[in-house]
């Protein structure tokens, strides 16, 4: 009999605690947000995550009635920002905006990673996707991807390509393309697109992958030529430029930009931000503004965001193996 009353007492305590948590959660959701929200950005001002974050932050602030600030913490391919995010208060007022490399590439190439995606973070929302474009210098005698493939196979190792750094999406996209088609093209890594794109324009390398905003001015001036993009389909920004997937079915390395929170962040905060981000992604002016920058708005739920990260981990893991990159 005593055990019966003990069990009943434990059950009642649990019920009371659960009810208290439910009330607390409901109160939080009703009041949220009641102070400024901060977006930690993994890259410097002007980069892809920064561009996307600022456009969304402005609309998010208008919809929530609270300031949404942007805090750039570039360095180590997003590791600096991710570490700061993992240590930030888990109160629903700090989020991180990053491209997929923070969680899909870094764990594959770094031995000293201090964070773990599944342990330390939770997906909130997809925000955008930005295809990279394969661009060549005008002196490169190839007017389309098939001609470039033929040229590379005729001159094994004779052509060069630049990238924004070893292990970058620019690097891994080309390595996957090379492996898929059996090409030998020499890699010349640079420290960011601020170095790699000028190297292409100056003829120091024959080709590279980069985002449209960093190339479009040189395309218009005739200093570089676009041959293909690395997304699953043609982009509305450059509909005459084919997707590599038209030659290699399933080829898709277009980087995503998404919002994440630290594990332990209130579910109500995550749900609210996710819902608002999805609504913002459908705003015509947001779609157009991003499109003008060569970026596609793609609102997506927390579950869709999480799935996209896992898909990138799988896809880029294969590319890292193909490139022979060892953890350092």
Q: What is the role of each PLM region?
A:
Residues 8-12:
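N-terminal export leaders
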């Amino acid at each position: 009999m005593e055990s019966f009353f003990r069990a009943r007492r434990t059950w009642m305590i649990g019920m009371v605690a659960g009810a208290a948590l439910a009330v607390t959660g409901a109160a939080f959701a009703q009041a949220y947000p009641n102070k400024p929200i901060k977006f930690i950005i993994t890259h410097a001002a002007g980069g892809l995550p920064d561009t996307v974050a600022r456009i969304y932050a402005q609309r998010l602030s208008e919809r929530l009635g609270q300031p949404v600030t942007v805090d750039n913490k570039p360095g180590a391919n997003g590791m600096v920002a991710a570490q700061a995010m993992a240590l930030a208060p888990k109160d629903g007022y700090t989020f991180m905006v990053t491209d997929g490399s923070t969680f899909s590439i870094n764990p594959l190439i770094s031995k000293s990673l201090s964070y773990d995606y599944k342990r330390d973070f939770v997906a909130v929302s997809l925000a955008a996707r930005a295809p990279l474009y394969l661009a060549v210098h005008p002196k490169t005698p190839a007017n389309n991807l098939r001609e470039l493939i033929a040229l590379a196979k005729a001159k094994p190792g004779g052509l060069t390509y630049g990238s924004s750094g070893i292990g970058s999406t620019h690097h891994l996209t080309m390595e996957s393309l090379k492996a898929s088609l059996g090409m030998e093209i020499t890699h010349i890594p640079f420290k960011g697109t601020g170095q790699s794109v000028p190297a292409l324009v100056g003829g120091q390398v024959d080709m590279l992958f980069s985002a449209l905003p960093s190339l479009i001015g040189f395309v218009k001036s005739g200093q570089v030529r676009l041959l293909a993009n690395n997304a699953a389909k043609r982009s509305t920004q450059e509909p005459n430029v084919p997707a590599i997937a038209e030659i290699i079915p399933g080829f898709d390395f277009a980087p995503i930009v998404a919002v994440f929170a630290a594990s332990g962040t209130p579910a109500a905060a995550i749900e609210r931000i996710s819902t608002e981000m999805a609504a913002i992604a459908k705003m015509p002016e947001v779609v157009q503004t991003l499109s003008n920058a060569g970026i596609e708005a793609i609102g997506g739920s927390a579950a869709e965001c999480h799935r996209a990260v896992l898909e990138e981990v799988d896809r880029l893991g294969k590319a890292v193996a193909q490139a022979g990159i060892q953890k350092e």
